[in-house]
Amino acid sequence: MAQDKFDVGGMTCAACQAHVDRAVSKLDGVQSVAVNLLAGSMMVDYDPAQVSPDDICTAVDRAGYSASPVDAGTGTAGSNGSTQARSGAAHMESPTKKLEAAASAMRTRLIVSIVFLIPLFYIGMGHMLGWPLPGIFTDHTHSMTLALTELVLLIPIVYVNDAYFINGFKSLAHGAPTMDALIAVGATASVARSLYAMFIMADQLATGQVHEAMMTSMDNLYFESAGTILSLVTVGKYLETRSKSKTGGAIEALIDLAPKTATVVAEDGSETTVDVDSILPGQVLRVRPGESIPVDGVVLEGSSAVDESALTGESIPAEKTAGATVNAATVNRTGSFTFRATRVGADTSLAKIIQLVEDANATKAPIARMADKVAGVFVPVVFVISAVTFLVWMALTGSVNEALTSAVAVLVISCPCALGLATPVAIMVGTGKGAEMGILFKSAEALENLRSVGTVVLDKTGTVTRGKPAVTDIVVATRADGSPAMSEKALLKLAAALERSSEHPLAEAIMAECETRGIVARMVEDFAAVPGRGVTAREGQNTIAAGNVRLMNELGAKVPAGLAEQFAAEGKTPLFFAKNGELAGTIAVADEVKETSAEAIAALRSLGVDVRMLTGDNRVTAEAIARRVGLSSEQVIADVLPADKERHVRELQDAGGKVAMVGDGINDSPALARADVGLAIGTGADIAKEGADVVLMRSDLMDVARAIELSRATIRNIKQDLFWALFYNGIGIPLAAGVFFPLTGWQLSPMFGAAAMSLSSVCVVSNALRLRTFKPKVAK
């Protein structure tokens, strides 16, 4: 299977989205289609042996829209994809830029519409509202002048808003009517009725019925109604487009962080400023204080503190010295340094993050399926309701004017856009907010599923703990007379001499502690490993050893009773040291618990989530760790082999409820993939963890709780928008049709209908924008 992303042009509402989806889904070989109305894009999974990108574009064209491939799932990028691969994030065009350009064009249309609408509305409604009008518009002999003036003022409004008519009637011709069709038919009906009235007026004037002609002009001209409908819809579209342009603010901010130029250091030491898109892997670059790092790389010389908050959400700058990795779009705060470029263009962490978020926006949340089904039949149903409304009003009143007023009101008040925007706008804002927090959702489905997770399984190593053993206790042995066997420093020197040649994780922890304290390991002789026990060696005239209780007993070095068990109960592994057959001391090593683990588990509990810890450690050690983070023994799954993690997740799923798995992605990929939602934690710049649905860039367990809160807030926002969109149409359409006329005696004007329709979409987008201010309440 291949996956391609396409730019789709001509979509203006949810009905358009549904028609494109339907047209492509019908093709043989197409497995899934996800159309994003907001971004004007489409993601298609298909079998290249059965269908090609050209076939997909042709299907979209036949549906009345345009499509072009962005980049191919097979790895061969299209034109836009190639540009991104060369230039990376610094030159990526975001949906925000497109929306800002659309808003600018819409503003021009709006200004022209308003300029001509004001005099049109004044002239058309002045006689009804008692406004003063020039005599040429009130004199009965000039009724045709009034009509022609209104028509002339309407023409520029129709001209700048011709897209509604072109797209609307085109969709009708393809048998797939859209919101533009509703507007086009509604406005055309008003204009057609007015032109018909002008013919009647001409006949009346020709036969000397001057007074009747003036009455016809006052009662039967709807030019101002058509102009108002078009102008108000354009007001709504402009506000909607402006609001939508703000939804991608988080990604836009990331793109803006990428510098356009960089300083390349040549072999002779000379420095040259070049465009970022010309940088190649292996080149050496210099970054000065205050500058953004242009590409990913490894520090060669110098040191600095680098602000990585844009990528990871971590507010404290990271210290960078020789050998440390640096990432594009992070900011150098203090010193100057040189680094070698390792990943450039579309391979940088920044470009991958942006692509991941955009791909997530291109997917569809399960909650959107109901809205899509409604949108797919919405417009045809509205046309039927409008036709029925016209016929009923004609039958009841015999008045074409009243029947036309209600029929047009039904057309223009209906709004499938509000339905279509509810999900994608909230998803875009939610995923963008997540990116700001260092939480990357790979799909809209993951964002939705996380909200309903009932159990979170935490892989202990690297998730609850740091994943790297460290020295926790240094205990010097006591002789029979109560004096210490040696000093703490001497014990560490002894340990360093024995462990310098070992590759055991415990040895690495001890050597790291010695290095921190400035202790240099001495050379030893006759070094030997004792399988299952430890190591022995000779240092000068002294025989030294390091190992477990069994080795100490064999050497005659007496270990205090219960000491090993005491450390084990605390989740620590003791390593005993002997010198010339006497116990010299004990160094305990443990995988340290992260500072926020206990707080994070408490936060998850307060969110109503059951927490389990999964580990390969023995139960005694596992329960010791569990106690430190607030978990009971029943919540611990111990003695688990890496290959069995997936089975335990499956068993929890079989017990009922959705399960999320949190791990570092190293040996738990099958478990991450098996879970309803897999979260890879502490990935830093490595965001492409296989099997993970959500990537947590920081090694902070609190981000799991934050991700759940964000998921719940986003889905709650979507439900609010869907409710109000359905409620609006459920009330608005019957009101426009005149269902409540017997009770209220009031008939809705098409102009009010157009205003209400415009505001409904603006309200949906504005509600989604509230997510930009989201702050976790529990996981602060």
Q: Predicted segments — roles?
A:
Residues 92-115, 167-190, 354-386, 403, ...:
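Soluble-to-membrane junctions at the N-terminal ends of transmembrane alpha-helices
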Residues 103-261, 373, 474, 745:
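Transmembrane helix-loop-helix hairpins at the membrane interface
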Residues 129-144, 173, 177, 192, ...:
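Membrane-embedded alpha-helical bundles of multi-pass transporters
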Residues 1, 282, 289, 363, ...:
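Conserved ATP-binding TGD loop and adjacent catalytic N/P-domain core of P-type ATPases
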Residues 108, 330, 454-503, 511, ...:
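ATP-driven catalytic headpiece of P-type ATPases
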Residues 28-46, 50, 54, 221-223, ...:
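Conserved cytosolic catalytic loops of P-type ATPases
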Residues 1-147, 244, 270-273, 351, ...:
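Flexible metal-binding regulatory segments at protein termini and peripheral loops
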Residues 201-205, 210-212, 227-289, 320, ...:
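Juxtamembrane coupling segments of multi-pass membrane pumps/enzymes
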